[in-house]
């Protein structure tokens, strides 16, 4: 969000519920149940902890949950300064307690979020923050209803089909200018009203215009036991590393000359490799292998042999370029393996320097770089000393994406 560094929004995390519909558990209410490897509330707090727009954070808990919350807080991935207050008999009164605590900090805006919605992200927070900065007094992230809706009567019989036009499913964080929503909550409490199911409803009752903003499909509330199971499965899938393997193959002809360059090492020899660049067949194969891990084409796409600027160029330039593309796309090179197929020259005496060159270019440790060599048993063009071939394999781990490549809801 542009100008985010000047924007500060108070946060109220509502975590005082007992979660009866999720069933009983030795771990306590659902906000303290483990999904992935940490409590639900720890996942939720971590997202606010890393959002630049987050100001003072107040967590509203049940008086009986002090120890549960303290334990959950220790499981957070990052640090977050926060204030803990006790909730009331209803969600509405718990939110009021949180708003009173936030008001004491002097912030202008507040986000009210359910602890049991751990799958929101910074994109949603940025969208909400931008709407507040643009003048909205109250805003509600929501998703258009896609399912057909039915209203029932006695005995579970369908009474009618409800038109879903202009119907939206409300989410949190629900966001407000602090003073109007605090005033509305105080008035609602004084009036004895306790039937509001969310904070936007109180804003509507108080005459505060509520703006809808686009919610997030994954930002669902963990209500039932099956929701917790689905959340755990989702986090388990997200934790699986995105490991990709790419292969590359290259061959260059041997012609009369004084030596060959392999993995950046010049080896004196009675012949040389023919090519537009320095014809380092090993680095060319590894360049293709790296590019293959992210679908970035091949070496010819990036350095066409028809381009005179690459005439005689050292092939480390090509490998550095491929490694940079991998990094820009979120990848970390974890292994590089090259097999050279040649009758001559002997690779063994130069193997260590070759490995050191690979490690330096790729920024990885020496034990992640492998160079092997074999003859072709005098078979084929390699066996006739007409050329040298190289086969390379690269292993790259890419950062997990917050959203899958395909919609897995169905």
Swiss-Prot record:
<feature type="binding site">
    <location>
        <position position="381"/>
    </location>
    <ligand>
        <name>4-CDP-2-C-methyl-D-erythritol 2-phosphate</name>
    </ligand>
</feature>
<dbReference type="InterPro" id="IPR018294">
    <property type="entry name" value="ISPD_synthase_CS"/>
</dbReference>
<feature type="site" description="Positions MEP for the nucleophilic attack">
    <location>
        <position position="221"/>
    </location>
</feature>
<comment type="pathway">
    <text>Isoprenoid biosynthesis; isopentenyl diphosphate biosynthesis via DXP pathway; isopentenyl diphosphate from 1-deoxy-D-xylulose 5-phosphate: step 2/6.</text>
</comment>
<feature type="site" description="Transition state stabilizer">
    <location>
        <position position="21"/>
    </location>
</feature>
<feature type="site" description="Transition state stabilizer">
    <location>
        <position position="276"/>
    </location>
</feature>
<dbReference type="Pfam" id="PF02542">
    <property type="entry name" value="YgbB"/>
</dbReference>
<comment type="function">
    <text>Bifunctional enzyme that catalyzes the formation of 4-diphosphocytidyl-2-C-methyl-D-erythritol from CTP and 2-C-methyl-D-erythritol 4-phosphate (MEP) (IspD), and catalyzes the conversion of 4-diphosphocytidyl-2-C-methyl-D-erythritol 2-phosphate (CDP-ME2P) to 2-C-methyl-D-erythritol 2,4-cyclodiphosphate (ME-CPP) with a corresponding release of cytidine 5-monophosphate (CMP) (IspF).</text>
</comment>
<dbReference type="InterPro" id="IPR029044">
    <property type="entry name" value="Nucleotide-diphossugar_trans"/>
</dbReference>
<feature type="binding site">
    <location>
        <position position="384"/>
    </location>
    <ligand>
        <name>4-CDP-2-C-methyl-D-erythritol 2-phosphate</name>
    </ligand>
</feature>
<comment type="similarity">
    <text>In the C-terminal section; belongs to the IspF family.</text>
</comment>
<dbReference type="GO" id="GO:0050518">
    <property type="term" value="F:2-C-methyl-D-erythritol 4-phosphate cytidylyltransferase activity"/>
</dbReference>
<dbReference type="InterPro" id="IPR034683">
    <property type="entry name" value="IspD/TarI"/>
</dbReference>
<feature type="region of interest" description="2-C-methyl-D-erythritol 2,4-cyclodiphosphate synthase">
    <location>
        <begin position="244"/>
        <end position="410"/>
    </location>
</feature>
<dbReference type="InterPro" id="IPR020555">
    <property type="entry name" value="MECDP_synthase_CS"/>
</dbReference>
<feature type="binding site">
    <location>
        <position position="284"/>
    </location>
    <ligand>
        <name>a divalent metal cation</name>
    </ligand>
</feature>
<feature type="region of interest" description="2-C-methyl-D-erythritol 4-phosphate cytidylyltransferase">
    <location>
        <begin position="1"/>
        <end position="243"/>
    </location>
</feature>
<feature type="binding site">
    <location>
        <begin position="276"/>
        <end position="277"/>
    </location>
    <ligand>
        <name>4-CDP-2-C-methyl-D-erythritol 2-phosphate</name>
    </ligand>
</feature>
<feature type="binding site">
    <location>
        <begin position="250"/>
        <end position="252"/>
    </location>
    <ligand>
        <name>4-CDP-2-C-methyl-D-erythritol 2-phosphate</name>
    </ligand>
</feature>
<dbReference type="Pfam" id="PF01128">
    <property type="entry name" value="IspD"/>
</dbReference>
<dbReference type="GO" id="GO:0046872">
    <property type="term" value="F:metal ion binding"/>
</dbReference>
<dbReference type="GO" id="GO:0019288">
    <property type="term" value="P:isopentenyl diphosphate biosynthetic process, methylerythritol 4-phosphate pathway"/>
</dbReference>
<protein>
    <recommendedName>
        <fullName>Bifunctional enzyme IspD/IspF</fullName>
        <ecNumber>2.7.7.60</ecNumber>
        <ecNumber>4.6.1.12</ecNumber>
    </recommendedName>
</protein>
<dbReference type="InterPro" id="IPR003526">
    <property type="entry name" value="MECDP_synthase"/>
</dbReference>
<feature type="binding site">
    <location>
        <position position="252"/>
    </location>
    <ligand>
        <name>a divalent metal cation</name>
    </ligand>
</feature>
<feature type="site" description="Transition state stabilizer">
    <location>
        <position position="375"/>
    </location>
</feature>
<dbReference type="GO" id="GO:0008685">
    <property type="term" value="F:2-C-methyl-D-erythritol 2,4-cyclodiphosphate synthase activity"/>
</dbReference>
<keyword id="KW-0414">Isoprene biosynthesis</keyword>
<feature type="binding site">
    <location>
        <begin position="374"/>
        <end position="377"/>
    </location>
    <ligand>
        <name>4-CDP-2-C-methyl-D-erythritol 2-phosphate</name>
    </ligand>
</feature>
<comment type="similarity">
    <text>In the N-terminal section; belongs to the IspD/TarI cytidylyltransferase family. IspD subfamily.</text>
</comment>
<dbReference type="GO" id="GO:0016114">
    <property type="term" value="P:terpenoid biosynthetic process"/>
</dbReference>
<comment type="pathway">
    <text>Isoprenoid biosynthesis; isopentenyl diphosphate biosynthesis via DXP pathway; isopentenyl diphosphate from 1-deoxy-D-xylulose 5-phosphate: step 4/6.</text>
</comment>
<dbReference type="InterPro" id="IPR001228">
    <property type="entry name" value="IspD"/>
</dbReference>
<keyword id="KW-0456">Lyase</keyword>
<dbReference type="InterPro" id="IPR036571">
    <property type="entry name" value="MECDP_synthase_sf"/>
</dbReference>
<feature type="site" description="Positions MEP for the nucleophilic attack">
    <location>
        <position position="164"/>
    </location>
</feature>
<feature type="binding site">
    <location>
        <position position="250"/>
    </location>
    <ligand>
        <name>a divalent metal cation</name>
    </ligand>
</feature>
<feature type="binding site">
    <location>
        <begin position="298"/>
        <end position="300"/>
    </location>
    <ligand>
        <name>4-CDP-2-C-methyl-D-erythritol 2-phosphate</name>
    </ligand>
</feature>
<keyword id="KW-0479">Metal-binding</keyword>
<feature type="site" description="Transition state stabilizer">
    <location>
        <position position="30"/>
    </location>
</feature>
<keyword id="KW-0548">Nucleotidyltransferase</keyword>
<keyword id="KW-0808">Transferase</keyword>
């Amino acid at each position: 969000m542009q100008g985010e560094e000047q924007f500060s929004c108070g946060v109220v995390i509502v975590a005082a519920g007992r979660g009866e519909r999720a069933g009983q558990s030795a771990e306590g209410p659902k906000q303290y149940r483990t999904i992935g490897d940490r409590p639900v509330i720890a996942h939720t707090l971590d997202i606010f902890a890393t959002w630049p727009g987050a100001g003072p954070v107040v967590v509203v808990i049940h008086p009986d949950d002090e120890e549960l919350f303290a334990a959950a807080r220790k499981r957070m991935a990052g640090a977050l300064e926060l204030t803990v207050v006790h909730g009331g008999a209803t969600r509405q009164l718990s939110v009021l307690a949180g708003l009173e605590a936030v008001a004491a900090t002097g912030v202008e805006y507040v986000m009210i979020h359910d602890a049991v919605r751990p799958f929101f992200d910074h994109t949603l927070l940025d969208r909400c923050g931008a709407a507040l900065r643009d003048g909205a007094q109250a805003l509600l992230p929501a998703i258009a209803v896609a399912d057909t809706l039915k209203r029932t009567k006695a005995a579970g019989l369908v009474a009618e089909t409800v038109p879903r036009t202009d119907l939206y499913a409300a989410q949190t964080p629900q966001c407000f200018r602090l003073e109007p929503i605090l005033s509305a909550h105080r008035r609602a409490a004084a009036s004895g009203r306790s039937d509001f199911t969310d904070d936007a409803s109180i804003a509507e009752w108080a005459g505060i215009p509520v703006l809808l903003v686009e919610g997030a499909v994954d930002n669902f509330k963990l209500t039932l036991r099956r929701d917790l199971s689905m959340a755990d499965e989702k986090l388990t899938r997200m934790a699986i590393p995105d490991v990709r393997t790419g292969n590359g193959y290259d061959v260059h002809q041997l012609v009369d000359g004084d030596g060959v360059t392999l993995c950046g090492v010049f080896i004196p020899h009675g012949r040389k490799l023919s090519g537009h660049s320095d014809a380092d067949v090993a680095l060319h194969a590894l360049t293709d292998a790296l590019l293959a891990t992210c679908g970035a084409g091949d070496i010819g796409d990036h350095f066409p042999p028809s381009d005179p600027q690459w005439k005689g160029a050292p092939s480390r330039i090509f490998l550095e370029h491929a490694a940079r593309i991998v990094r820009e796309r979120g990848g970390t090179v974890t292994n590089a393996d090259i097999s050279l197929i040649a009758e001559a020259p002997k690779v063994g005496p130069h193997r260590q320097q070759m490995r050191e060159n690979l490690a330096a270019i790729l920024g990885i440790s020496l034990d992640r770089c492998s160079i092997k060599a074999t003859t072709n048993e005098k078979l084929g063009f390699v066996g006739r000393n007409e050329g040298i071939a190289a086969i390379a394999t690269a292993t790259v781990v890419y950062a997990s994406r917050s959203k899958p490549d395909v919609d897995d809801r169905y």
